[in-house]
């Protein structure tokens, strides 16, 4: 059964990667990077929703298509690790099992926070060391300081570039054309 599904999944991935392999200002078919079924997703995305993403970074992060669009933009800049870390922290905070909490905490630390981590986020030494210390007794708040720094970095750096990007402007244009 899985083998039968593989070609469809690969085709979708090729479409997404094809769009992402270009620079961020050359990707105008935004539907390729939205989650789920792209055409239906774009039809459900209103101009008002996409415009609201410019209201604040937190508004963007609260909308699943906003996160998908921002992730696609960050991939074009090879800097999606910050968003992936932020999302992993948000998911981590929902953990209720103590055993799972410890396992997830170590996985997040090793993936994003540790020096030379595979997807190391850009945080200062003090924040990294405070987070390392928090790992001695992981809790739901052990990544709060690092997550806050990463959020601030994305908000001040990546988010303004996203709002000016051809990718975002094309998305707005496409959603407005649907209204016409």
Curated annotation (Swiss-Prot):
InterPro entries: RGS, RGS_RGS8, RGS_sf, RGS_subdom1/3, RGS_subdomain_2
An annotated Gene Ontology molecular function: G-protein alpha-subunit binding
Tissue localization of expression: Expressed at high levels in brain. Very little expression detected in other tissues. Detected in Purkinje cells in the cerebellum.
Gene Ontology cellular component annotations, sorted alphabetically: cytoplasmic side of plasma membrane; dendrite; neuronal cell body membrane; nucleus; perikaryon; synapse
Subcellular location: Cell membrane; Membrane; Perikaryon; Cell projection, Dendrite
SMART domains: RGS
One Pfam family hit: RGS
Topological relation to the membrane, as annotated: Peripheral membrane protein
Domain RGS: 56-171
GO biological process, one term: G protein-coupled acetylcholine receptor signaling pathway
Modified residues (Phosphoserine): 26
Function as written in the Swiss-Prot or TrEMBL entry: Regulates G protein-coupled receptor signaling cascades, including signaling via muscarinic acetylcholine receptor CHRM2 and dopamine receptor DRD2. Inhibits signal transduction by increasing the GTPase activity of G protein alpha subunits, thereby driving them into their inactive GDP-bound form. Modulates the activity of potassium channels that are activated in response to DRD2 and CHRM2 signaling.
Assembly and binders: Interacts with GNAO1 and GNAI3.
Protein name: Regulator of G-protein signaling 8
Protein species of origin: Rattus norvegicus (Rat)
Lineage, broadest ranks: Eukaryota, Metazoa, Chordata, Craniata, Vertebrata
């Amino acid at each position: 059964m899985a083998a039968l599904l593989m070609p469809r999944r690969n085709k979708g991935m090729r479409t997404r990667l094809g769009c992402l392999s270009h620079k961020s200002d050359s990707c105008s078919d935004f539907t390729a990077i939205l989650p789920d079924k792209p055409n239906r997703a774009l039809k459900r995305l209103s101009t008002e929703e996409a415009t609201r993403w410019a209201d604040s970074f937190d508004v963007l992060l609260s909308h699943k298509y906003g996160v998908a669009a921002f992730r696609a933009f960050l991939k074009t800049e090879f800097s999606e690790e910050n968003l992936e870390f932020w999302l992993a922290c948000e998911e981590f905070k929902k953990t209720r099992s103590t055993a799972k909490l410890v396992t997830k905490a170590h996985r997040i630390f090793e993936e994003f926070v540790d020096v030379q981590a595979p997807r190391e986020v850009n945080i200062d030494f003090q924040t990294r060391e405070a987070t390392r210390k928090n790992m001695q007794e992981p809790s739901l708040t052990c990544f709060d300081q690092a997550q806050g720094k990463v959020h601030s970095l994305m908000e001040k750096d990546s988010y303004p570039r996203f709002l000016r990007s051809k990718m975002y402007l094309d998305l707005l244009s496409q959603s407005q054309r649907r209204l016409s």
